[in-house]
Amino acid sequence: MNIDERFMAAFEGFDAAHGQTQISDERRAGKQKAKSYIVRKPLTLDLIREHLQGLNGVGSIPINEHNKCKFGALDIDQYPLDLVAIDKKLRDMEVPCVVCRSKSGGAHIFFFFNDWISAGELRDKASEIAAYLGYGGCEIFPKQEQILVERGDVGNFINLPYFDSEQTLRFAVDEDGEPASLERFLELVSARSVDPNVFVGLTFGEQVDEFVEWSPCLNCMFGQGIPEGTRNTVMFAAAVACKKEQPDNWRQRLEEINMKYCTPPLPATE
């Protein structure tokens, strides 16, 4: 396969539609205005070529008509963001992925698979990874676990990297923390593509026995400790879980968790 075909194969997704983004010269709050929309036509090799040449930007819809995926992503839209530090942490965690700079200057953390994985399993594990990174509230692609094609459902698309590949700002980070060329990106995709069963079996940190009935994402957060900056989000989720677990004693239970796991504990006024 040539380089265009390899790039298209990496982002194989929904057959009958794709996304497009038109960027105007007009700016708002320092950012270029963009219009994104779904096109109910297949993502073709010609469209991929135009994307890589910087003519028309495209996006791929990860979830296919069978609710399975060949790729997925975390979309971290917080600033400032250190892509090199995120990439290093993910490699330390031994998570097979490729970190790219997004269109808006955030991070797209792409997961690639050598076989189809169910959208639900992908989203579950991706949420654990996001939580362990400290970005538990970020967007996950696919956004849906299930679509009903017979009623016209189409999943959400994610903008692809390497728009205008020769001088792109949507580049991957290589092992040395440098922007990777398109060819190097495709080498990283090949090297870091993973079997779905291996991906689902990834573990991070310690599991906390007292939260074994809670979601894996929340358990993961308590296993690594709750640093300042993420306490409100995590403790809100914990409050919901406590109400289900101990409806008559949830406030006391929540405060015990707060004192034990938050560093420093969340003030009572919050």
Question: Model-derived features: where do they sit?
Answer:
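Short, well-ordered loop/turn elements at secondary-structure boundaries
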Residues: G54-L55, N67-C69, D92-E94, K103-G106, ...
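Modules that initiate DNA replication and primer synthesis
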Residues: I76-Y79, K88-R91, G105-L122, S127, ...
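DNA replication initiation on ssDNA origins
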Residues: M1-F71, P80-I86, F157, Y162-S165, ...
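Short amphipathic beta-strand starts and helix->beta connectors
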Residues: L52-S60, L90-C97, C220-G225
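Catalytic cores of nucleic-acid ligases and guanylyltransferases
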Residues: A29-L45, E65, C69, D75-K88, ...
